[in-house]
């Protein structure tokens, strides 16, 4: 009896100790806070301006998939289970941030820092259809910033340039390419260019 009780106590201690060492949701990764991404605006930190966003409600920082995961119709979720609601696409579905052409400051909040290969930014082309699923062929790459394989700060501020020929509703697609893994983090940002 004593041996069984000791086995149970040791097993329980091992489980609790292992759980304490396991990474938590708050420790994983990064999201675009300004201008806010779909995922960020679906979280309490973003004011829940977007609703029915799946896992993004609790973990906007966790849209992580292999680099160059540009799945037609699944750009916003990067095909990650639980984030599929972010892939819904209509002209009115998402909260939009008003911006202007020219320099645009982007702020990433990193809940876990990783060596960085690059920060890449895309924007929808003129004439894209906001009522069709997002497709990388309908985006132009507008910036690539070398991460120099360095570990960034927890708050990363960068400036990109929004082309002067863009007006109205567009989507900016931000990709944080990790330097020491095969993965990247993906964020769709809905903007109204004035």
Curated annotation (Swiss-Prot):
| Enzyme superclass (EC) | oxidoreductase
According to its UniProt record, which cofactors does this protein need? Answer: Cu(2+)
Query: Which positions are annotated as binding Cu cation?
Result: 29, 114
Location (main, coarse): secreted
Q: Tell me the InterPro entries matching this sequence.
A: Cellulose/chitin-bd_N, GlcNAc_Chitin_IntDeg, Ig_E-set
- Catalytic reactions on record: [(1->4)-N-acetyl-beta-D-glucosaminyl]n+m + reduced acceptor + O2 = [(1->4)-N-acetyl-beta-D-glucosaminyl]m-1-(1->4)-2-(acetylamino)-2-deoxy-D-glucono-1,5-lactone + [(1->4)-N-acetyl-beta-D-glucosaminyl]n + acceptor + H2O
Subcellular location(s): the record lists: Secreted
Task: Provide the GO biological process annotations.
Answer: chitin catabolic process; polysaccharide catabolic process
| SUPFAM superfamilies assigned | E set domains
Signal peptide (UniProt feature, chain positions): 1-28
Task: Tell me if Kinase is a UniProt keyword of this record.
Answer: no
Q: Where is the Chitin-binding type-4 domain?
A: 29-191
Cofactor binding note from Swiss-Prot or TrEMBL: The copper metal center seems to be reduced from a Cu(II) to Cu(I) oxidation state prior to binding of dioxygen for catalysis.
Can you supply one Gene Ontology CC term for this chain's record?
Answer: extracellular region
Q: What is its EC number?
A: 1.14.99.53
Q: What is this protein called?
A: Lytic chitin monooxygenase
């Amino acid at each position: 009896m004593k041996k069984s009780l000791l086995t149970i106590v040791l097993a329980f201690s091992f489980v609790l100790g292992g759980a304490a060492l396991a990474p938590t949701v708050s420790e994983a990764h990064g999201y675009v806070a300004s201008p806010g991404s779909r995922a960020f605006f679906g979280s309490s930190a973003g004011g829940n301006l977007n609703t029915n966003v799946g896992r993004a409600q609790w973990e906007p920082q966790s849209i992580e998939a292999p680099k160059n995961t540009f799945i037609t119709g699944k750009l916003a979720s990067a095909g990650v289970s639980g984030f599929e609601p972010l892939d819904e696409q209509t002209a009115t579905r998402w909260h939009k941030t008003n911006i202007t052409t020219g320099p645009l400051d982007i702020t990433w909040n990193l809940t876990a820092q990783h060596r960085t290969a690059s920060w890449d930014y895309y924007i929808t082309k003129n004439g894209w259809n906001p009522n069709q699923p997002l497709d990388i062929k309908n985006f132009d790459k507008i910036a690539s910033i070398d991460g120099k394989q360095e570990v960034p700060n927890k708050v990363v501020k960068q400036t990109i340039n929004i082309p002067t020929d863009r007006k109205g509703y567009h989507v900016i697609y931000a990709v944080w390419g990790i330097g020491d893994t095969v993965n990247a983090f993906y964020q769709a940002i809905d903007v109204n260019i004035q």
